[in-house]
């Protein structure tokens, strides 16, 4: 089993705490909404500090704080003695326990059969993820016979096979022994997840006039189509929308006060709507005036990651002069400059990654 190295600071997992509730944006002048969001974060930190981190440190050790991220799902169960980890980027599922094999078996079954709605799974409670009749991982994991794992009978048989044939152990620094199984996802698991969201992507693409391939390319790079995604920047969901920045622009365009909360952005439909609308805002407002569609697309992709202001400053500190400069350049030159001269290495690589990912989805209309 590969050693966990991508551990996030405690504060980074706060955004999941509000995701189990529901929130309806209000078209009003009230400011109470913003106060509520801050209160939720404060309460979330208290819960996290008092329960989650304390339990993990005591049970697994301080160097074993594994938490959810953009492309990783992590769920603790059995009073935090068992955990499941899905790497949506690497296509690897690891389920491990400090308890007995019954706990391991139970976690295997519930992980393989969990649903796709983040509101249905409380990542901070130690209970099992609910079993769904429409498992999110269906088509992404096969059992020892190559069968799709889509019901309890097959999941139970596969769990038995794994425990009898694939069981491994490792020792923690605190001296405890972990028993675990590792499951490889099928080749093309990313594309399988992408297909689950095609109806929503097509709907939002038509609504805002954004090409589906661009939406899908951004979703792949941002979250690898992980509906539970959260990042260090407090970006939420499939398209990694940041509530306090892009979220405010999105709500303003919709005529809502404040910003979307976590529950709003963990809803796949609302998340894809929000991310696609933000692309339209970049196109129609922040980057208005760029005339070449390809050059504008490059600028939109880069701005989705680093902000429109940072993109324009690569060309000139004056917005209008920057747009004039972009219009003087060929699309290839714009791409070259954004991938070499942007001060953020993350932004430079982001444009490359999204452009490459987008190519896989050009056939989708």
From Swiss-Prot:
Localization annotation: Cell outer membrane
Lineage: Bacteria, Pseudomonadati, Pseudomonadota, Gammaproteobacteria, Pasteurellales
Disulfide bonds: none
GO cellular component: cell outer membrane
Annotated protein name in UniProt: Membrane-bound lytic murein transglycosylase C
SUPFAM superfamilies: Lysozyme-like
InterPro entries for this protein: Lysozyme-like_dom_sf, Murein_transglycosylaseC, Murein_transglycosylaseC_N, Transglyc_AS, Transglycosylase_SLT_dom_1
Lipid modification (S-diacylglycerol cysteine), residues: 20
Single GO MF annotation: hydrolase activity, acting on glycosyl bonds
Family: Belongs to the transglycosylase Slt family.
